[in-house]
Amino acid sequence: MMRLARFTQGFSFNKNVAKHRGSGSSNGTGNGSGTGNGQGLGGSCSANGLAATGGVGGGGGSGSGGGGCGSGSGSGSGKRKSKARTKCFGGTVFRCCLPCRGGGSAAPATSPPQTPAQTPDELKVIPEDCNLEKSAEQKRDLLERNNKEDDLLNRTVSGSELDLYGGAGGGTKKHSLADTIDTSVTTPISLKTLINDVDEELDQQLSAADIAAASLASGLVARRAEPETLSDASVSPTAVVQQQQQQQQQLQQPLLQSQPHFVPSSGNILSQVTLYSGSNPSTNPCQSAVQNQGQNSNPNPNQNPNTNPNQNQQRCSCQPQTSPLPHIKEEEESDQANFKHQTSLKEHQPLPPPITIATGYCGSCESVHHSSATSSSAGTVPPGGQQTQEYIAGTSSTPSPRIKLKFRKPHKSCWSRIVLAPIGSAGGSSSATTVIGSNSNETLASSSTTGGTATTTQNSSSVSVAAHHRLTSSSASALATSHPSNSQLLPTSKMQAEQGSIGDLQKYHSRYLKNRRHTLANVRFDVENGQGARSPLEGGSPSAGLVLQNLPQRRESFLYRSDSDFEMSPKSMSRNSSIASERFKEQEASILVDRSHGEDLIVTPFAQILASLRSVRNNLLSLTNVPASNKSRRPNQSSSASRSGNPPGAPLSQGEEAYTRLATDTIEELDWCLDQLETIQTHRSVSDMASLKFKRMLNKELSHFSESSRSGNQISEYICSTFLDKQQEFDLPSLRVEDNPELVAANAAAGQQSAGQYARSRSPRGPPMSQISGVKRPLSHTNSFTGERLPTFGVETPRENELGTLLGELDTWGIQIFSIGEFSVNRPLTCVAYTIFQSRELLTSLMIPPKTFLNFMSTLEDHYVKDNPFHNSLHAADVTQSTNVLLNTPALEGVFTPLEVGGALFAACIHDVDHPGLTNQFLVNSSSELALMYNDESVLENHHLAVAFKLLQNQGCDIFCNMQKKQRQTLRKMVIDIVLSTDMSKHMSLLADLKTMVETKKVAGSGVLLLDNYTDRIQVLENLVHCADLSNPTKPLPLYKRWVALLMEEFFLQGDKERESGMDISPMCDRHNATIEKSQVGFIDYIVHPLWETWADLVHPDAQDILDTLEENRDYYQSMIPPSPPPSGVDENPQEDRIRFQVTLEESDQENLAELEEGDESGGESTTTGTTGTTAASALSGAGGGGGGGGGMAPRTGGCQNQPQHGGM
């Protein structure tokens, strides 16, 4: 039925074409121009003088009927005859754009991007050299000899006529590589032809290009190409043929109804091709050609001024396709040299409309470009209607077919997504752009200028009219109009870089990753010394780099606010671009390098210094016009090196305004760098600069927070005393309580009253310090697992099925951990840890006996204090499960070794063992044995480590017994570092270190976080476990609320102890004055959100859902805060202004505030002041004083302490 359909259609075409026969002449170069009265539909495209795929050759066209990349070769009859197929190639490369493939179909990934080619089913006999002049008689003899080899299909319907509609006609002659030796060396064929046609029959085989074009024309959605594969089409050939038949039926009528008496000019090949305009889909496909004919009219019928014999070799303007493999660079260089020689011969000929392919390869550059509506012409049009436009030429890299065979790989996806950005003409034009399958990972903008307003329709012959209509319709919805921008499309996958679209992977990182926030390389190496690590820039690496996108717009943490007292430009976002001249900005935008790292905000001081110094270097190059030295140690990926390459504008001369402004800004930038460097203390690392800055900014934020409401003071003190390291407290611009004489005297008096009581209330002295307190004697269950069968989930439980269902979701964030604790008979840590180690096969890789593992976990869980509301084994199980989920982050896949993963999970299991339910500050203030043993430094964290490693010495509990000594030492070091990092007083230092490391790598130009040493790797793991420890606010709201209730109950129990012992009640530990809702808002704003913001930035976009949940929970608690009045009047004692946080009335006193305010009003000038911590009783006392002197010191009632809660400030 298919052959019958072709026969019928061909017969109707031939009958119609026969009406328009005329006389024509050939110019002897295979590029004749007809003078008859017929109309050559499909345009006057010709390539290399070859009679290739064509449309309906108009009568009288002696060679102007070709519609694809070839030219019609009819001898004045308008009816082209089919010819035997041979194949030829002169150089093949990886990919080709649409016009290079005859018949209007997209090219496969292996098609040449610079040289026209033809499909195997459409290729006919071709003259040996398109540049040699042949007489018409010789051509006819050659055609007659080849016509004898054709069958009935060749006599009835021309393969080239079907080709215009994407048909797959042609014979089934067997091909071999030997057939290509004696043919032309200027017209390559696709690699698919060479592979598929050798010693096998081709029965109407469709090319990948035809399939891709048909899938686009039919509205099919193209899938992205898989990494490390070449792009191709995988659509059913039957479906494609059906789509093509529908296109043929739709196009027959407009083609046959076209008006005769017209011969199009063949001046500019692509400008004479008819298509539907995206802005006017109903336009007659011949109208544009008629308009162009009026512009390109020529009195000489035999010679067109725009026609050039060498124009047959015009190639598309795809960017050069270079291979990243070093062993084929020599072949590429030789081919590039040959192409440059050929290009020099074509400088005098008219050039096709410019097309800039922002990605490495296109697939259908010209056809898609010309389907994008209209392009404005310049103010002046050269003779013949040729538009003067900028042509972006690139050298071609053409590996041999032998090399290409190595790149042919199986695939599962259609052609890659393409975004084209045509550049406006010299006179100025508004260039429309077309987007095919673009996504959020691709940045697109078309360069546009201002100029003339006259418009002409750009035409194309690469795909059928119906396909053009579909393409333009879909592209118009994606990008209706062009928008000016300086950014170009950046490659979206490492696959393109590996295939040669960028060159080598190092250049890929330099041009792409620098506009991304952070990148984490997927490499493995030994933890201690980094041996065995593969370079992430190694092209053969399975995942040489992970591109992490810019974060979406969301509320930023306080780290990005101004710190104007200490730096000139706090955000340093545009530190480079803000001081550069306009000419230098244009230079930056024109060469596709990062513009001061795009939208990123650099907040760490050391990274800001690096960015400023880089800016100074760039400005110096711009001012002096000295090219960057090739011997410079600056890497190629440095943005400054590429910026200084070829200045597009005239060099700045001394005396110009731009020169003076740039010089002044450079001096200011250098002064700022010097000021920052002079303040660095030599005994501290550069990360301490960020830590001190963040602490300083947090103190500023907390000062405003404490003044915003009456409860803000207590929350501010809690955050300062818990999350700020006391070791560097002297660097903070805050006043300690001891510096206030009056408060010292008041505290001394109060201390004398309670000294005896406090001394008597101290706990009895513990065991000798040579022993580790809290370690119990081995329990009976240690050797209880004597049978051969161990419990499925590590614990014996009657509800094993329900437990197994929940444990099956251990890789899910926000698991029902409380239900796991219930179903596991209060053994959540044992079952969670055992299941995770089993699923990750860590018991096998680390050679841990399962029985030994269960013995140790059971013993460890017994050493968690069950009476603690929060710090118990359920919290340890929650942190372990959260750590497991974070380790499964796609961005970290394959980064850490099993030893590192096992160490992180082990540290999460033990990080709070034998926790007494008290804070480090309480142990220090009470002079506990633990504080004395560990010198007040991370008291509990050191204790957790000591207990855990001591339990490993119990019989049958050493889970690392089969490890080598070096591995055991490495794991112990890792676990110690990770557990010590869970000390909340190290929070700011940990956050600053991570942010400094990330931003420094980003500013340095590499954009790749190598993690090639122990320090960097353990830093990521420390932050990972720290995030898991502070993950409660990021869990679903019901879980979060339950954890908050448990934590506050533990705080209140500590406050009760402090009250009973006569100690100062720690912030947020007084159950009578605590404000839970507002404390959680402050906790999220100043602690949790900055941490998770940095982590989400590192692994973007994998943690976006977690960050969204955090913001939702914060909004919930913000909505639950009761309205709070502003602080009361001004303090009478000016000396009290020096105190950091003044304890004021709480929200619980709202009922008494009205009475207090009435007393203030009746008392005239009397004001209510509180010099020390006050409670509801003091408020009542002040109000009862009427207008006399209300608000004074009230006696203690109800056990409340009349003492300042400085919280370690």
UniProtKB/Swiss-Prot annotation:
Disulfide bridges in this chain: none
Domain PDEase, chain residue ranges per copy: 795-1124
Biased composition (Polar residues): 275-290, 315-324, 385-400, 484-498, 627-645, 1199-1209
InterPro entries membership: HD/PDEase_dom, PDE4_UCR, PDEase, PDEase_catalytic_dom, PDEase_catalytic_dom_sf, PDEase_CS
Listed Low complexity bias regions: 291-314, 372-383, 445-462, 472-483, 1164-1181
Cofactor note: Binds 2 divalent metal cations per subunit. Site 1 may preferentially bind zinc ions, while site 2 has a preference for magnesium and/or manganese ions.
Record: active site: 871
Single GO biological process annotation from the record: circadian rhythm
Co-factor requirement: a divalent metal cation
Biased composition regions of type Acidic residues, renumbered to the chain: 1146-1163
Entry binding sites for a divalent metal cation 1: 875, 911-912, 1029
Chain residue ranges for the region called Disordered: 16-35, 59-82, 275-353, 372-403, 442-498, 626-655, 754-792, 1146-1209
Positions annotated to bind 3',5'-cyclic AMP: 871-875, 912, 1029, 1080
Biased composition (Gly residues): 25-35, 59-77, 1182-1193
Catalysis performed (reactions): 3',5'-cyclic AMP + H2O = AMP + H(+)
GO CC, alphabetical: cytosol; nucleus; synapse
Residues of the site described as Binds AMP, but not cAMP: 1032
Molecular function via GO: 3',5'-cyclic-AMP phosphodiesterase activity; 3',5'-cyclic-GMP phosphodiesterase activity; metal ion binding
Entry binding sites for a divalent metal cation 2: 912
EC number of this enzyme: 3.1.4.53
UniProt function note: Hydrolyzes the second messenger cAMP, which is a key regulator of many important physiological processes. Vital for female fertility. Required for learning/memory.
Family: Belongs to the cyclic nucleotide phosphodiesterase family. PDE4 subfamily.
Summary of subunit composition and partner proteins: Monomer.
Protein name as catalogued: 3',5'-cyclic-AMP phosphodiesterase, isoform I
